[in-house]
């Protein structure tokens, strides 16, 4: 009996000591440590998870199950609108801040019933690591918010799903706004009402998004075709964003939209299957795209480009990257996709002196990303 107890104790210690962040952030959030060497904690209830995320202590928070927030804060029935029609596959809109009245005044009014927990995500305080264990760490019905000066945060190997998918303004999966040093890695998002990822108008500074799976398959969409429109929105006033090794699948727009004052390094990602556009670049959006794969993307970048774009068009032009990124930029790969050729070399100097992610040939992303991105793929 004592021997069996000893073995159980050894097993627990081994399991606990093995918990930790896998790898390290590349690119702009290089050096992020999250909760560091804090003793791991294992929430068992939604309330306990919220408490660990919001307190002032450095934390390593390990998720070993699904935390379902559905119905934890009740529901609301109200009058919304139907900007894209009332067909079964069309999203409806919650009238948040009189959005229907101010922006969709001609849309018919409809009754909407949504889950309150999804509308506003959980706040994540500074110095936190949020880790999923294996394929078990799931947050359902509520997102995460890194805001109000929060910094030094790692979110790894977690799935965020089912946030009022029928309704625009039903909630975002991950919000970052007025933050710094945030690393999102091996995260899966699916069936989200609004944005899968949004960086708000305040400065979010240094952010790396890597090896994540943004899944746009949905029963409801603004384009009424099962392709989610509200993908990734980067609109901060002073943002440096690295996107590397992500799988961006089944969207019809905003994947990503970039504006404000945002420098995006999109490297070795895989865009697959879009009925609309991938990039939407507004004023103040600066995008360098290299070593990516675009497969079945009808419109890679929506015209006109309001900011600046360097698409790494050919080996000769790509030599210009060396002086600022420390490597020759890699060409992108295309299959059944629209054109993507622009070379605003002036934006390259913005990378000078910064932590820049390495780049591989697009064939590496083509072979690895679909099978390695997202939760449970560490």
From Swiss-Prot:
Question: Which cysteines does the record link by disulfide bonds?
Answer: 81-100, 90-224, 321-329
Q: Where in the cell is it found?
A: Secreted
As given in the record, the signal peptide range reads: 1-18
The reaction(s) catalysed by this protein are: Eliminative cleavage of (1->4)-alpha-D-galacturonan methyl ester to give oligosaccharides with 4-deoxy-6-O-methyl-alpha-D-galact-4-enuronosyl groups at their non-reducing ends
Q: Which organism is it from?
A: Aspergillus clavatus (strain ATCC 1007 / CBS 513.65 / DSM 816 / NCTC 3887 / NRRL 1 / QM 1276 / 107)
EC numbers, comma separated: 4.2.2.10
Q: What is this protein called?
A: Probable pectin lyase A
Family under the similarity heading: Belongs to the polysaccharide lyase 1 family.
Q: Name one GO biological process term.
A: cell wall organization
Q: Which UniProt keywords apply?
A: Carbohydrate metabolism, Cell wall biogenesis/degradation, Disulfide bond, Lyase, Polysaccharide degradation, Secreted, Signal
- Does Signal appear among the keywords? yes
One Pfam family it belongs to = Pectate_lyase_4
Catalytic center residues: 254
What is the stated purpose of this protein? Pectinolytic enzymes consist of four classes of enzymes: pectin lyase, polygalacturonase, pectin methylesterase and rhamnogalacturonase. Among pectinolytic enzymes, pectin lyase is the most important in depolymerization of pectin, since it cleaves internal glycosidic bonds of highly methylated pectins.
Which InterPro entries does the record associate with it? Pec_lyase, Pectin_lyas_fold, Pectin_lyase_fold/virulence, PEL
Give the GO molecular function terms: pectate lyase activity; pectin lyase activity
A single GO cellular-component term from the record reads: extracellular region
């Amino acid at each position: 009996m004592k021997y069996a107890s000893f073995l159980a104790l050894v097993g627990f210690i081994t399991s606990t000591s093995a918990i930790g962040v896998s790898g390290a952030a590349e690119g702009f959030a290089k050096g992020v440590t999250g909760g560091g060497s804090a003793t791991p904690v294992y929430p068992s209830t939604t309330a306990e998870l919220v408490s660990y995320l919001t307190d002032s202590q450095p934390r390593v928070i390990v998720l070993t199950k699904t935390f379902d927030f559905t119905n934890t804060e009740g529901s609301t029935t109200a009058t919304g609108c139907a900007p894209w029609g009332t067909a079964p596959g069309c999203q409806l809109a919650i009238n948040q801040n009189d959005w229907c009245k101010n922006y969709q005044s001609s849309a018919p009014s409809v009754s909407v019933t949504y889950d309150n927990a999804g509308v506003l995500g959980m706040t994540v305080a500074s110095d936190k690591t949020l880790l999923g264990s294996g394929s078990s760490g799931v947050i359902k019905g509520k997102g995460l918010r890194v805001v109000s000066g929060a910094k030094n945060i790692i979110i790894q190997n977690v799935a965020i799903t089912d946030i009022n998918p029928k309704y625009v303004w039903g909630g975002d999966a991950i919000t970052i706004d007025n933050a710094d040093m945030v690393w999102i890695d091996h995260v899966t998002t699916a069936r989200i009402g609004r944005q899968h990822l949004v960086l708000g108008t305040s400065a979010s500074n240094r952010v790396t998004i890597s090896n994540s799976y943004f899944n746009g398959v949905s029963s409801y969409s603004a384009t009424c075709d099962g392709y989610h429109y509200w993908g990734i929105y980067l609109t901060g006033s002073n943002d440096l964003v690295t996107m590397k090794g992500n799988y961006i699948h089944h969207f019809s727009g905003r994947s990503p939209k970039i504006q404000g004052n945002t420098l995006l390094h999109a490297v070795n990602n895989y865009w697959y299957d879009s009925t609309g556009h991938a990039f939407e670049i507004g004023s103040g959006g600066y995008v360098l795209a290299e070593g990516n794969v675009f497969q079945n993307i009808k419109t890679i970048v929506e015209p006109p480009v309001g900011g600046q774009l360097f698409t790494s068009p050919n080996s000769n032009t790509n030599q210009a990257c060396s002086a600022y990124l420390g490597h020759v930029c890699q060409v992108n790969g295309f299959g059944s996709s629209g054109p993507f050729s622009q070379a605003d070399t002036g934006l390259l100097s913005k990378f000078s002196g910064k932590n820049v992610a390495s780049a591989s040939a697009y064939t590496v992303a083509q072979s690895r990303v679909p099978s390695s991105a997202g939760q449970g793929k560490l």
